[in-house]
Design a protein with these regions (language model features):
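Conserved blade-ending motifs and adjacent loop-strand segments that build the rim/top face
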Residues: 263, 377-398
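Sec/Tat signal peptide C-region and signal peptidase I cleavage site
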Residues: 18-21
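Internal metal/ion-chelating core segments
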Residues: 195, 202-260
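Bacterial N-terminal signal peptides
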Residues: 5-16
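Acidic, Gly/Ser/Thr-rich repeat motifs that build Ca2+-stabilized beta-propeller blades
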Residues: 23-214, 268-271, 276-284, 335-373, ...
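Repeat-solenoid scaffold signature
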Residues: 254-290, 295
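Beta-propeller blade signature
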Residues: 162-175, 221-239, 293-295
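Surface-exposed loop and turn segments in beta-propeller and other repeat-based domains
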Residues: 111-125, 182-192, 229, 238-259, ...
Length: 420
């Protein structure tokens, strides 16, 4: 989500590499490619192509087009929509970053839900998630994540410096017009705020590195620091208490809510419904966008290892891509695609897609389908390229169709169903 802001900075900082610098980042030959059709991605303009740990960790073969689909508009006119989720009856909650919750009826009509706190700070990125509890049908509970100003900070003086991500719980009123009984569960320094609810009911929340901390990896020590929430996946109970089995509970100086560490800018989060495991999508700096299968207590490397570069084009930490005790991504893209929301498909309308991971793509303006063998990617397909729209989110609907959210002003929710 920091990409738009960073564009102007990057443009002013990029310089031509000297021959020596170019030699320093030129990788050795990669492992043999997987068999199959050519990958979707072209190489980076300067030829940079970091060496993967295994064939298929990047630039997987182009997946076969196994399903035709039709696209219909469910609702439109959203401004800065960042997330959407389904209520049990099929209606849709939409979170807009400027600070609005929208409710999409089954007829496609859009209404606004009032009651967001006035402390929400849109310039710090605003409203991120609006997600119903797994037991919403009986408790009408929803969870929110949004940014507020740090205590004592001046919004005009600190337009993009570190915000505070708030995780809150509230009730949706019986008439669906407002949220009530809002309770703050957690305040975490950083930005981001994607949220998923695990099968055991616990809440998994992301907190990323704000743009205001700088553009070089040396400016980002927080993802490796257990006394900071930045660059982490956090885990709390639905009442805001800390699960006793969190990995760093009781460790001196560590935040007990930390579940996993070593991330830069998580943009998507989902639970694999078949395994119950958490998966994330992440923006690298210049290249090195990642998909990770996240486990409790594990370290995902940033900024010590990674498959991207500084915005100046120089290597990060000597171009290091592996280190003992740090996890490898399931998949990465270089050059970057700016992945956003992600979701697994398990429905019956598209049998050929069952078990596939779908990734909303901002830069390439497509919906990415990753075919998997366990936790290894074996194919990649780009969908919806004909729309030429930035895709912000993707979810399977209760009807088994696939729904996507487009980005920006005039955003839409689209429904993908099999062609008649």
């Amino acid at each position: 989500m920091t990409r738009t802001f960073l564009f102007l900075i990057i443009a002013s900082l990029l310089t031509r590499l000297t021959p020596a610098e170019a030699q320093n980042i030129r990788p050795a030959p990669r492992p043999p490619a997987q068999t199959g059709t050519p990958p979707n991605e072209s190489a980076a303009p300067d030829g940079y192509a970091p060496i993967p740990e295994w064939a298929g960790q990047t630039r997987a073969p182009r997946a076969a087009k196994t399903a035709g689909y039709s696209v219909e508009t469910v609702a439109e006119g959203f401004t800065g929509a960042f997330s959407f989720s389904f209520l049990p009856d099929g209606r849709i909650l939409v979170g807009e970053r400027p600070g609005h919750i929208k409710l999409v009826g089954k007829d496609g009509k859009v209404s606004e839900i009032e009651g967001l706190p006035t402390t929400l700070w849109a310039r710090g990125q605003g409203l991120f998630e609006v997600r119903p509890d797994r037991a919403f049908a009986t408790n009408r509970t929803i969870y929110l994540t949004y940014t507020v100003l740090p205590d004592g900070a001046n919004a005009s003086a600190l337009p993009r410096l570190p915000a505070v991500v708030v995780v809150a719980r509230a009730k949706l009123s019986s008439d669906d017009k407002r949220i009530e009984d809002l309770k703050v569960l957690l305040n975490a320094e950083g930005t981001g705020g994607r949220l998923a609810q695990a099968p055991d009911g616990t809440l998994l929340i992301t907190s990323s590195i704000p743009a205001g901390l700088g553009i070089n990896s040396v400016d980002w020590p927080q993802p490796q620091a257990l006394d900071s929430n930045m660059g982490k996946v956090l885990r709390i109970n639905p009442d805001g208490t800390i699960p006793k089995d969190n990995p760093f509970v009781g460790r001196a100086g560590a935040h007990p809510e930390i579940y996993a560490l070593g991330f830069r800018d998580i943009q998507g989060i989902t639970i694999n419904p078949r395994t119950g495991k958490l998966w994330t999508s992440e923006h690298g700096p210049r290249g090195g966008d990642e998909i990770n299968a996240v486990e409790k207590g594990k370290n995902y490397g940033f900024p010590v290892i990674g498959y991207g570069r500084e915005y100046t084009g120089k290597p990060i930490n000597g171009d290091k891509t592996r280190q003992d005790g740090m996890e490898q991504p399931v998949y990465f893209w270089t050059p970057d695609i700016a992945p956003s929301g992600i979701g697994f498909y398990t429905g019956k309308l598209f049998p050929a897609w069952q078990g596939d991971l779908f990734v909303a793509e901002l830069v390439g303006r497509s919906l990415v389908r990753l075919t998997l063998n366990g936790e290894r990617v074996v194919g990649e397909e780009r969908l919806l390229t004909e729309l030429n729209s930035r895709i912000r989110g993707v979810n399977e609907g209760p009807d088994g169709a696939l729904y996507v959210l487009t980005d920006g002003n005039g955003g839409k929710i689209l429904r993908l169903a099999p062609k008649p």
